């Protein structure tokens, strides 16, 4: 009798293992296809899928394959595992920068031998925390874009405290620009007041650069993907940010008068989002500085466990990107992005002549 019971139990266990193993495998394979298509299509309606990084989905998919492998033995498991690994390596934002180098090479000490070298930093100040601006200034930047910025008075007091008369400041309510040289503030539409700070910067050598610090609409953080309302909210927020960015970039382009342009800030969107497609469509040939020369992990949020890259610096064709990195901070929930740019000699000379 006991032997019969054991036999039935083993039979039931075998059936359970078979169907559960195939269930895990089908879910993993289907998820792989869905994530791949979501990356290709980048449609607003599926924007919720583009918030977690590709490697996070890869870990889920590979975990399902591993669980399936304990239950059933099939070559399809290996095929789906290889598909997940290939998907992650090819599509993950981190793969490209890690291929250039495992560790950042940009140092705190700036090369001062070239007068056309410009160091740019963008950082979210985490609720107007002045200490993060102090951190940024230790890198001797020529330009700092801040979001959730300290007030103009607080920034001016910091410069007086440091007895640094090279810098000027514009903005300071949500976005601000701190730069060496002469800043001339630009007026943006009132609807963008809480999302931008724009200025033209005249460098000591007379070159003029158009600058913009931006902070797009806050993202939602809900992850209940089984709830239709979650997808709707992500969809609407993504559309709001796209409208903001298009309006901001259109205004920036109209104000620049063909000057060299640098803009950056907190985009509040995963780099897998279709939000960033607006930049080449409106601005043309612009370079994401970390994409061009960054090494190591470029993710900026959160500071202590960076899983997504939402803070960026972009430069026009007038600049060459020397180096870039994402740097851990002590006083913000974001990491700061630091980039060294070289204003091309021809462009510098042309603007001096004009």
Where are these regions (language model features)?
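Active-site beta-strand/loop signature of hydrolases that rely on acidic residues for catalysis
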Residues: 32, 49, 119-125, 132-156, ...
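Metal-dependent phosphoester-hydrolase catalytic domains
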Residues: 6-78, 200, 253-261, 267-354
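Transmembrane alpha-helices and immediately adjacent membrane-cytoplasm interface residues
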Residues: 59-107
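Structured beta-strand-rich core segments of catalytic domains in phosphoester-bond hydrolases
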Residues: 89-109, 131, 143, 147-220, ...
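Catalytic-adjacent loop/helix segments of enzymes that bind and process anionic phosphate/sulfate esters
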Residues: 186-252, 348-354
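Short, solvent-exposed loop/turn segments at secondary-structure junctions
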Residues: 126-128, 151, 183, 216-219, ...
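Structural motif corresponding to alpha-helix initiation and N-cap regions
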Residues: 129-130, 307
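Short extracytoplasmic/periplasmic juxtamembrane "stem" segments immediately C-terminal to an N-terminal membrane anchor
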Residues: 105-127
